[in-house]
Structure formats: structure tokens, C-alpha cells
């Protein structure tokens, strides 16, 4: 994984989006980063380790190429503005969900479910009434 500066990360992320525009996906993760490069031991605590600054670790991959950057709390506003503009520019291929078909299907299913018990309840009553009238 390549650790880049913020500006380089954004340019490489733009390249990843362009490469995956026709087919493929770009996966982006964001998590809090405390500066550790080694895993935390299971038992006990690490003595004398205090993170000096809150940081965010951003990673992006297309499945083959991986890039990452660390953004400090001082730079987060500037980075977030550039990052949001980049996402707006490159996520134009997203499609809105078709809500009309979903609501029609659920209404039809609900109507059928409501009609089935009502029909079953009225059918014996109608048959009993018909049998009673035929017997007289």
C-alpha cells in the first residue's frame, strides 16, 4: 500500500475513478488513525503511548492498486472540501432507485394478502347460506 500526501492522494483517487468509470468499483475506507504501525498487544497496555494529534486514515483501492493517506485534524477542513468536490465530480454514474415499482409491488402484495383471508372467511359463509337455502 502506498502512503501518499493529501494532494497526491486526491490526484491518484481521480485516476482510479477514471479507470473504473466504464466498469469496476472503487472502494474507499475511512477510519481513525492513532499513529501506530504495530498491532496492539492482546494482554496489557502499551506504556507511554499517547497520540499527539487526532488523525484520519483514508484508503482507496480498485482491487489491484491500493493508495492511502493520513489527514491530521489541522488539515481536515481543507481536505474534506477537496474530497467532497472530487466525489461529486466522479460519482455521476450512480442511478436513483426506482421507487414506483417497489411501491406498486408492495401495495399489490398487501392487497392480495388482505383479500385472501377475507375471501376465505366469506367463502364458507356463502356456501353455508347456499346449502341452507337449497335444503329448504
UniProtKB/Swiss-Prot annotation:
It is found in: Cytoplasm. GO terms for cellular component: cytoplasm; cytosol; extracellular region; ficolin-1-rich granule lumen; nucleus; secretory granule lumen; signal recognition particle, endoplasmic reticulum targeting. It comes from the Eukaryota. Gene3D superfamilies: Signal recognition particle alu RNA binding heterodimer, srp9/1 (3.30.720.10). Keywords: Cytoplasm, Phosphoprotein, Ribonucleoprotein, RNA-binding, Signal recognition particle. The keyword Cytoplasm applies. Its main location: cytoplasm. The modification Phosphotyrosine is found at residue 27. Residues 116-136 are annotated as: Disordered. SUPFAM superfamilies: Signal recognition particle alu RNA binding heterodimer, SRP9/14 (SSF54762). GO terms for biological process: cotranslational protein targeting to membrane; protein targeting to ER; SRP-dependent cotranslational protein targeting to membrane. GO terms for molecular function: 7S RNA binding; endoplasmic reticulum signal peptide binding; RNA binding. Pfam families: SRP14. Belongs to the SRP14 family. Component of the signal recognition particle (SRP) complex, a ribonucleoprotein complex that mediates the cotranslational targeting of secretory and membrane proteins to the endoplasmic reticulum (ER). SRP9 together with SRP14 and the Alu portion of the SRP RNA, constitutes the elongation arrest domain of SRP. The complex of SRP9 and SRP14 is required for SRP RNA binding. PANTHER family: SIGNAL RECOGNITION PARTICLE 14 KD PROTEIN. Heterodimer with SRP9; binds RNA as heterodimer. Component of a signal recognition particle (SRP) complex that consists of a 7SL RNA molecule of 300 nucleotides and six protein subunits: SRP72, SRP68, SRP54, SRP19, SRP14 and SRP9. This is Signal recognition particle 14 kDa protein. It comes from Homo sapiens (Human). The lineage of its organism: Eukaryota, Metazoa, Chordata, Craniata, Vertebrata.
